[in-house]
Amino acid sequence: MMVVCAAAAVRFLAVFTMMALCSLPLLGASATLNSVLINSNAIKNLPPPLGGAGGQPGSAVSVAPGVLYEGGNKYQTLDNYQPYPCAEDEECGSDEYCSSPSRGAAGVGGVQICLACRKRRKRCMRHAMCCPGNYCKNGICMPSDHSHFPRGEIEESIIENLGNDHNAAAGDGYPRRTTLTSKIYHTKGQEGSVCLRSSDCAAGLCCARHFWSKICKPVLKEGQVCTKHKRKGSHGLEIFQRCYCGEGLACRIQKDHHQASNSSRLHTCQRH
């Protein structure tokens, strides 16, 4: 009986020893797996800029293609957009103009920057504010009518543009603003065009005040009502200023117009 018990104890001890020896590789594999799992979490705590969006600790890395940080993230231009400062329109692109942004723009501080051009029927103060193919008329961007531009002037501008492009290709390589655009802006203004002086307007037009700005208006013809200024410089008080009478005409009191008050007599353009 004791011999049987001793044999059973020996068998049990042998089996237990074998189980202990077999469990060692499993424990090693488990430890290795745990270390891999622990190390796999390290990708979530990478230092910037490899730690995902913003590079903050604990932020997950996106596995979508094209989203990894490469210095040119497609979302970076929207969040970190920097306006281009300028001093005049020529420093901006062909579809931009130089001006101060609206008061609602934050972080600009009143500095002039390049803004997107204004499309047709949008308010404007000068030609450069309107998109290509439009010009400023009566404070509104209107489509340009190129028929009044001299053909020779346009051809000369194209030749100058080709010369500038050739110089840019052979020289520093920087693009230059075309001459044609500047010539269009400096052509004689038509009726309703914004102006500063009468020399800015075409023949038969003068520069006269209209609301808050000055526009090209027709020179008065014979029989049309005119304004007789008693003092020099008094025309600056008019909101709707009239042009002067045409050549050979003078602003005089209408002969067949009789009023009781001398101040209300009607003046018209008459022959000398």
From Swiss-Prot:
Keyword Disulfide bond: yes
Keyword Signal tagged: yes
Main location: secreted
Gene Ontology cellular component terms for the protein in this record: extracellular region; extracellular space; plasma membrane
GO terms assigned for molecular function: co-receptor binding; low-density lipoprotein particle receptor binding; receptor antagonist activity
Chain spans, region DKK-type Cys-1: 86-141
Location of the protein in the cell: Secreted
Signal peptide: 1-31
Carbohydrate attachment residues: 62, 262
GO term, biological process aspect, one: face morphogenesis
Region (DKK-type Cys-2): 195-269
Entries under CDD domains matching the protein: Dkk1_Cys2 (cd23272), Dkk1_N_Cys1 (cd23026)
Gene3D superfamilies the UniProt entry points to: Lipase, subunit A
Entry comment, domain topic: The C-terminal cysteine-rich domain mediates interaction with LRP5 and LRP6.
Family statement drawn from the similarity comment of this UniProt entry: Belongs to the dickkopf family.
Protein's name according to its UniProt entry: Dickkopf-related protein 1
The organism of origin for this protein: Mus musculus
Originating gene: Dkk1
